[in-house]
Design a protein with these regions (language model features):
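A conserved amphipathic terminal alpha-helix motif
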Residues: 115-150
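Hydrophobic ligand-binding cavity/cleft-lining segments
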Residues: 1-38, 43-44
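Short aromatic-glycine motifs in intrinsically disordered, low-complexity regions
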Residues: 49-57
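Short, solvent-exposed aromatic-acidic interface loops
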Residues: 79-84, 112-119
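Hydrophobic-ligand binding "helix-grip"
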Residues: 38-39, 59-106
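Hydrophobic pocket/interface hotspot
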Residues: 19-20, 29, 48-50, 66, ...
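Aromatic-glycine hotspot motif
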Residues: 2-16, 67, 101-111
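Soluble or luminal CAZymes and related metallo-dependent hydrolases
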Residues: 58, 92, 131-135
């Protein structure tokens, strides 16, 4: 299996700082990431949890670690589903990259995800994320709505 990458880009009619806040503020992430809020101190090496209330109890749906952060232009973190039937080892974590740039009040957000080829069930996980070519687009559309709403 060669290098598998899912990458999507969207233009958002909002300043880069607003888009950045949408990506890292737990009150904002709940609006576009299936009700999940982020829990992190956003420092390299720190844990990052995506948690939500499910059937009356707090549950972590995705966990990982912050790899790199350069507000408001770059965020890199790892992800794994702690509820999946796979060992919680570094090779099974995927990488997610947010890259932002702004020109004339319009922010370009590019999200890419890789690491599938070394991970357990990598090809299946790639196909799940790739989603017949949609990739991150459904989530990016929701991020755009939240950021543009102010």
């Amino acid at each position: 299996m060669g290098k598998l990458v899912v990458e999507n880009t969207i233009s958002i009619h909002a300043p880069i700082d607003k888009v950045w806040d949408t990506l890292v503020n737990p009150e904002e992430t709940k609006k576009y990431m299936f009700g999940c809020e982020t829990v992190s101190d956003w420092k390299p090496g720190s844990p990052l949890l995506w948690r939500a209330n499910y059937q009356g109890k707090e549950m972590v749906f995705v966990k990982g670690n912050v790899i790199a952060i350069q507000p408001p232009v770059l965020l890199t973190y790892t992800v794994i589903d702690p509820n999946a039937n796979m060992p919680d080892i570094p090779d099974n974590y995927l990488n997610v990259y947010y890259r932002l740039s702004e020109q004339d009040g319009i922010t370009t957000l590019t999200v890419s995800q890789d690491g599938f080829e070394k991970a357990a069930d990598g090809e299946k996980r790639y196909n799940d994320v790739y989603n017949k070519g949609e990739g991150w687009n459904p989530i990016l559309v929701e991020i755009k709505k939240v950021a543009e709403a102010g």
